[in-house]
Amino acid sequence: MEREGLEWIVAFLRMLVSWGASCAMIFGGVVPYIPQYRDIRRTQNAEGFSIYVCLMLLIANILRILFWFGHHFESPLLWQSIIMIVTMLLMLKLCTEVRVANELNPKRRSFTDFDTAFFWHWTRFIDFIQCVLAFTGVTGYITYLLLDSPLFVEILGFLAVFTEALLGVPQLYRNHQNYSTEGMSIKMVLMWTSGDTFKSAYFVLNQAPFQFSICGLLQVFVDIAILLQVYLYSAYPQKPVSHATSAKAL
């Protein structure tokens, strides 16, 4: 009787841990962006944050959702993608509003201009929505046509996680161009690192598709590189680039 009771407790604890891990996986990905969002809102300055981070996460999570139709993976990962897309759109909305408000004579730039020089630097949030919808429509249609091809499905999954693995690269490049990490939330990067480490372990333990595990580890390496930038640029400060060059970086 005691043994049965003990087994029930162990089973309950395992279920609790599994439920907690799933919740952490679903919502943990958006937590790092909370301090960055608050910093931008408080300072009304978005120059230190690369909006290309949002672009890469939107692409990665849209592709991951499409990958799910060809290769079902755990539901928490699917919900994580949906919540991350909403979060990135909110980040883009704030960054766009702040950037336009800080420009003296903002020239209207829109998605329908199809000007590559100003890609992802449009003046209205609706243009970002149009771009995301266009990308989703095109990739969704291609996926619908090739969903029966195992090779296409695996490539789609790889592109999804590989794009997410390069998430920190735009921020890494922006910091390098500015020779500074000013304006970037260090809390965000620390949360990236801890979250990506947890995520990589989650992928391995739950036997997620191999693409997830490999690219999760790559993400951790990029996070560590950004943290090294924080140390180097604070310990050995260099002459900052001009505002014009900074704005040009990304």
UniProtKB/Swiss-Prot annotation:
GO terms for cellular component: cytosol; endosome; membrane; trans-Golgi network. The keyword Membrane applies. Gene3D superfamilies: 1.20.1280.290. It comes from the Eukaryota. It is found in: Membrane. Keywords: Membrane, Repeat, Transmembrane, Transmembrane helix. The chain crosses the membrane at residues 15-35, 49-69, 72-92, 118-138, 151-173, 212-232. Pfam families: PQ-loop. Signal peptide: none annotated. It is a multi-pass membrane protein. The keyword Transmembrane helix applies. GO terms for biological process: phospholipid translocation; retrograde transport, endosome to Golgi. Residues 14-80, 149-215 form the PQ-loop domain. This is Solute carrier family 66 member 2.
